[in-house]
């Protein structure tokens, strides 16, 4: 019998316990609405690393969506502080003249990230 307080693991442990109780993997999987392949994957995880090994592990590397590089981000922040009355469109155009290529919405995203989204905060 497997016991845990973690709700993610609780469902998985419940499936393993039910299969042990019924002595029938197919019935347990049907009752819990899980494939047999998933059951055997859970069982293998418990065999390898115990109950705590069942915590969801992401296979993907983290994807930082639309993240601008540090130099561009710093240039946008510096420009926003130097010219707080300029909007995102003008800031984008002026930065482009300086060799920093970022879109209007990119400027807006950086402002939001640094809490500079309105005129009062840029002053």
From Swiss-Prot:
Domain of life of the source: Bacteria
Gene: ylbG
Protein name, as recorded: Protein YlbG
Pfam families, per the entry: HTH_29
Upper taxonomic lineage: Bacteria, Pseudomonadati, Pseudomonadota, Gammaproteobacteria, Enterobacterales
Misc note: May be missing up to 225 C-terminal residues compared to orthologs.
